[in-house]
Regions:
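A short, basic/flexible loop-to-alpha-helix module at the beginning of a structural domain
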Residues: 2-16
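Glycine-rich Rossmann-fold phosphate-binding loop(s) that bind the pyrophosphate
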Residues: 24-25
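N-terminal Rossmann-fold NAD(P) dinucleotide-binding loop
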Residues: 28-29
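Aromatic pocket-lining residues of Rossmann-like dinucleotide-binding sites
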Residues: 35
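Conserved N-terminal Rossmann-fold NAD(P) cofactor-binding segment
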Residues: 43, 47-85, 99, 323-326
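Rossmann-like NAD(P)-binding element
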Residues: 66-127
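Rossmann-like NAD(P)(H) cofactor-binding subdomain of soluble oxidoreductases
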Residues: 101-167
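C-terminal substrate-binding/catalytic lobe of Rossmann-fold NAD(P)-dependent dehydrogenases
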Residues: 146-152, 162-339, 358-360
Length: 360
């Protein structure tokens, strides 16, 4: 039995769980730390446009290897795309003073184009996770640019928003967050909405729980307040410390776990829709089953009419943003294989608001 296990471990078909992170700023490095701490990867390769920053992050993380589960941490090379299991793109640029939202979008689209072109050139079989903002638009851009099946290109979507929602509900009702089940759907931005029809406390529908809770006089007003707090919660963090990083790093680790461990977990990642909910030509946050192949299935939840309308409105906002992109979405160039991966680390607000606002 031991001999058979040894043969299987030495089989050339065995692939390490390599994760390449493109972007070495606050989010990329925090995710690398959380990923290493979780013991999800055998190799973590980190790249940043500012090479000195990237090398500093790698060295700082490597000095902690004695305290992590076994993992190799190093600087990424273009060839790492080829055999990576997961490629996480956090790279992006911040808005310049006086710069329009559309101009910012155009610059980030170009960055995604360059990175995707290089990944495709390496014949990668990885799943790509987009974190750069506006995440839903850039997920759609990456999907179109790569020509890959939609399941292999996903965005971080509303996973973090949903976690914030659960936290706020936990605080409001005095229930442990692990017993709160709730989702934010749609755009990772101002048009997102709370799926109250899917919200429950330990299996009890929220409306039923609320009647027994009696913690507030006006549940309708409380619902509005909680939804707005989700949308604006990151502003408070940015006002205090200038950036968000910890919660988004943990959210990305949750997504990575579903993929690297083939968990078939349900998370509200951003996925390109192909007729689900009557929508197509757009990517947004919706419940999806995630496995080692990426999105296995987009779940079509039986949403009530008002939530279906909110989802359609969110999709319309994103379609308008996609329509404003002036760069070609389909593959148009073959980059030089000798080029190193390109990225920026101006990702201090990578979970920043989508086209309809600014949020992290």
């Amino acid at each position: 039995m031991r001999e058979r296990q040894a043969i299987e471990m030495n089989d050339d078909s065995w692939k390490p769980r390599k994760v390449v992170i493109v972007g070495a700023g606050a989010v990329g490095s925090t995710f690398a730390y959380a990923l290493a701490q979780a013991g999800l990867a055998d190799e973590i390769a980190l790249h940043g446009a500012n090479r000195e920053l990237a090398l500093g992050q790698v060295l700082d993380l490597a000095h902690g290897q004695a305290f992590f589960p076994s993992v190799q941490i190093r600087e990424a090379q273009a060839a790492d795309y080829a055999d990576a299991r997961l490629i996480v793109i956090t790279a992006g640029v911040r808005q310049r003073p006086g710069e329009s939202r559309l101009a910012l979008l155009q610059r980030n689209v170009q960055i995604i184009h360059d990175i995707i072109d290089e990944i495709v050139l390496q014949n990668s079989t990885a799943v790509i996770l987009i974190v750069s903002n506006p995440v839903d638009v850039l997920t759609y851009v990456a999907h179109k640019r790569s020509g890959w099946p939609r399941g292999r290109i996903i965005g971080s979507g509303t996973v973090l928003d949903s976690a914030r929602f659960r936290h706020l509900l936990s605080q409001h009702f005095g229930v442990d967050v692990h017993n709160v089940h709730a989702y934010i759907l749609g755009e990772h931005g101002d048009s997102e909405f709370a799926a109250w029809s899917m919200t429950n406390m330990g299996g009890m529908p929220i409306e039923q729980f609320c009647r027994q809770c009696a913690k507030c006089d006006d549940w309708t007003a409380a619902r509005r307040r909680l939804t707005e707090q989700v949308k604006h919660s990151a502003y408070h963090i940015i006002d205090y410390k200038g950036t968000t990083s910890f919660a988004v790093g943990l959210a990305l680790t949750q997504i990575a776990a579903a993929i690297l461990r083939n968990q078939h977990g349900v998370l509200t990642v951003s996925s390109v829709l192909e007729g689900e909910y009557g929508l197509s030509g757009v990517s947004l946050g919706i419940p999806c089953i995630l496995s080692q192949r990426g999105v296995e299935k987009v779940l079509e939840v039986a949403l009530p009419a008002d939530e279906l309308e909110a989802l359609a409105k969110s999709a319309a906002v994103l379609r308008q943003a996609i329509a404003e992109i002036h760069l070609p979405l389909n593959p148009s160039r073959k980059p030089d294989a000798s080029e190193p991966p390109r990225a920026t680390n101006n990702e201090d607000r990578p979970d920043g608001r989508q086209p309809s606002g600014v949020h992290a």
